[in-house]
Amino acid sequence: MSATQNYGTGRRKTATARVFLRPGTGKISINNRGLDQFFGRETARMVVRQPLELTETVEKFDIFVTVVGGGVSGQAGAIRHGITRALIEYDETLRSSLRKAGYVTRDAREVERKKVGLRKARKRPQYSKR
């Protein structure tokens, strides 16, 4: 492994992303596929690029990502979190601007479990008075 790469782990919902930043031209590879090929949804692509656009490092790094678990939104959020952590490892001065944008904090919201006697986590069966 080269010493010129930075690593960050990102998590969101049940998705986990391992992100490697290497000096390059701005190519983003997710599970050996391009960003546009991996995410069909434009909002997901936008979420992934957010920390790079904020720190103006879009064409400074090649990014290699391995992501597992979750759905489209969770994976995009996990990749964003991982890129943020890798950028902080690369340059600690970026932390304040990334924190202000809210990218450093791990979004801890998880799916609430279904309870016995209820239809879903909180949805109750219809109440009948008589």
Curated annotation (Swiss-Prot):
Keyword annotations of the record: Ribonucleoprotein, Ribosomal protein
Record-level GO BP terms: translation
Disulfide bonds: none
PROSITE patterns for this protein: RIBOSOMAL_S9
GO CC annotation, single: cytosolic small ribosomal subunit
Gene3D superfamilies: 3.30.230.10
GO molecular-function term, one example from the UniProt record: structural constituent of ribosome
Record-given protein name: Small ribosomal subunit protein uS9
Organism: Pseudomonas aeruginosa (strain ATCC 15692 / DSM 22644 / CIP 104116 / JCM 14847 / LMG 12228 / 1C / PRS 101 / PAO1)
Name of the gene: rpsI
